[in-house]
């Protein structure tokens, strides 16, 4: 198998699972180089995972003729600059979420990719895992009848108690909807279809927050983005959904992250979309009880880089990637739509079109995409 060669830009907190899965799981991928502003981090990653090249700058990676896909794992407000430079250098790009810190950035990246005939896409890819794929199958096969609505909740108290450098979560491109919203919105549109318009209210509950994790314990951060966001979506199908994300609430973890899909004949309880599996429950009134549904698809474990591997397969076979920009752009427009609605007090129309990518193959062979 000819592997697609990847360069990783950014070796921060999320990079570990990507390094592991790219080098040990997905046969479509070959990680040939890493780059980070802190060179020691790149050196450590390269030594641990056998990566042959360490680039001094991202532009060195983009100039490497061996690199086919750039994996952008930088901080959210840096995504646009890195992805844009990679595309202009003629590289395909897979970016961590979000696509950009605002829709204008996503629009520019999409334009460049289309003009140059390059693939652009990105996270989240959790919807390709066993949990969401099984839920999609249940809905598509009619187990809850016609979907009429949804509810999604991500309730948390922020990142300053555990993350080693959490300040970017409260700056441009951060906040609960930009950080965690993409997991929920991506799952929702894969289960329910595209969104037509949105409405929202939001606020900054705590203008200053204190870091309690090491090594920055005691540092006080200014909060620049809304951290309590309640939104309503109207799907193109006519169904109505709600989504609530916050970094401000003390709440038990086991009850704080979920999606529910309501149908004309039943309700589906969807697992945490930040994970690749979890408990799936189905309620149908004629049964009178809620029953647990087993996983029907592969990749129940933490399989981040699955979307990157899918892009590599798409690149070599000529099909569309499942995590393509048409999806990440639609999600970004929804998120910005919430901000616009909260500011204006009006519904915001979502203009981008969205189509669901094909479901994952069954059965799956771990490490090989269909």
Predicted feature residues:
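N-terminal Rossmann-like dinucleotide-binding module
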Residues: 1-49
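Active-site loop of classical SDR/Rossmann-like NAD(P)-dependent oxidoreductases
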Residues: 17, 297-308
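Glycine- and charged-residue-rich phosphate/anionic-cofactor binding loop of Rossmann-like
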Residues: 30-31, 290-296, 313-331
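Short acidic low-complexity segments
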Residues: 53-65
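Beta-strand-loop-alpha-helix segment that lines the small-molecule cofactor/substrate pocket
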Residues: 69, 75-127, 142
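C-terminal capping/lid region of NAD(P)-dependent oxidoreductase domains
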Residues: 118, 145-149, 340-370
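Predominantly a Rossmann-like dinucleotide-binding segment in NAD(P)-dependent oxidoreductases
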Residues: 126-222, 345
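Contiguous beta-strand/loop segments that form the cofactor/metal-binding neighborhood of enzyme cores
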Residues: 186-279, 305-317, 321, 337, ...
